[in-house]
Amino acid sequence: MMQEFYASDAVSTNGSLEIFEADINECISGSAYLEGYVIERDDTTVGYGMLARSYSTEFGKPCVWIEDLYLKDECRGCGLGTQFIEYVNGLYPNALLRLEVEAENDSAIRVYKRCGFDFLPYLEMKK
């Protein structure tokens, strides 16, 4: 599923098997930074989510990044994305939730806005 997600238009990088393996190993190692979740419907795996924990000096509180949120095509629009975000809110009720979304991903943007997210007015950079 990670390969499907990173090959989709929802992500601007393609990832690699090496990165996917490192991500999964980090999740199952009991990492303080990364958590992985399997999303199921009717006892079938239909998606996954990954959360990264940090602290936001900008907002003065713990921060949880929704790094990945992927649902198979046939399960989009069924409320599972909203349920996952509500679950994360319940796990981290006092944390700032952040995520990235491609500007063209209108359906995801609608879900995130309904869940209370809004846009920040700056660009993200990496090194």
Regions found by a protein language model. Give the residues of each.
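Conserved GNAT-fold acetyl-CoA-binding loop/helix
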Residues: Q3-E26
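A short helix-loop-beta-strand connector motif used in the catalytic cores of GNAT acetyltransferases and
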Residues: E26-V38
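Conserved beta-strand in the GNAT
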Residues: G36-V38, T44-R53
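Glycine-rich acyl-CoA binding loop
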Residues: I39, G77-T82
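Conserved donor-binding loop and adjoining core beta-sheet/short helix segment
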Residues: G49-C63, E67
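A short, internal acetyl-CoA/4′-phosphopantetheine-binding micro-motif in the GNAT/acyltransferase core
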Residues: I66-R76
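Conserved beta-strand-loop-alpha-helix junction that forms the acyl-donor binding cleft
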Residues: R76, V88, P93, R98-I109, ...
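Conserved active-site alpha-helix within GNAT-family acetyltransferase domains
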Residues: T82, E86, A103-P121
